[in-house]
């Protein structure tokens, strides 16, 4: 039997970066298009609000019911006051999954051309919440520049019974974020890496 989920016992890469570099400044939903103007979402995913929590973007996908979601994306974008060490990102990419007692955890570095100066990771695992089983993916993108940096966290959670039905839409969400980030970096005037 697994222990009850305790949100206070779960930490994230963002918390680790804040402890190492300094307080992060969350980018509000209204400013997301300024940072990632090409970011879109699959048509059936709807924007939602979260009571008591601040997120840059929350998308929900319902297939069979209006009473619960079958897919969820939480996207957070933060300004970072300093340089984030690569090892910190790589060592903590799966932290939220480990702290949540997920199973079948996998974590890897994503390849990004060196000219972008992006540290990118993907971690996935299976979470059990009561009688519900969900597959979770976490993508992290850290951009270091001389003027500070940015952290993008993308969490996608899909009900295990809907994995095959939503697979292409999940791929669209992750690929669109990746491409939008690189396009935004390409457009930035005289970007200098730290």
Regions picked out by a protein language model, each given a short descriptive name:
Residues 66-108:
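Extracellular-facing segments of soluble proteins and assemblies that are Gly/Ser/Thr-biased and enriched
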Residues 1-70, 81, 127-135, 143-194:
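N-terminal targeting sequences that direct proteins away from the cytosol to non-cytosolic compartments
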Residues 91-144, 183-187, 191-194:
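Signature of long, low-cysteine stretches enriched in small and polar/charged residues
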């Amino acid at each position: 039997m697994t222990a009850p989920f305790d949100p206070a016992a779960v930490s994230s890469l963002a918390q680790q970066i804040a402890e190492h570099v300094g307080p992060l400044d969350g980018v509000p939903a209204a400013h997301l298009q300024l940072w990632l103007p090409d970011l879109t979402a699959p048509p059936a995913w709807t924007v939602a609000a979260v009571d008591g929590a601040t997120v840059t973007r929350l998308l929900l996908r319902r297939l069979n019911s209006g009473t619960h979601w079958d897919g969820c994306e939480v996207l957070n974008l933060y300004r970072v006051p300093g340089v984030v060490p690569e090892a910190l990102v790589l060592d903590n990419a799966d932290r939220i999954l480990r702290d949540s007692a997920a199973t079948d955890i996998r974590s890897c570095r994503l390849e990004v051309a060196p000219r972008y100066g992006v540290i990118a990771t993907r971690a996935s695992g299976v979470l059990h919440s009561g009688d519900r089983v969900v597959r979770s993916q976490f993508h992290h993108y850290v951009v270091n520049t001389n003027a500070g940096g940015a952290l993008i966290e993308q969490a996608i959670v899909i009900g295990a019974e809907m994995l095959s039905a939503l697979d292409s839409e999940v791929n669209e969400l992750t690929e669109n974020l990746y491409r939008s980030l690189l396009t935004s970096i390409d457009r930035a005037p005289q970007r200098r890496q730290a």
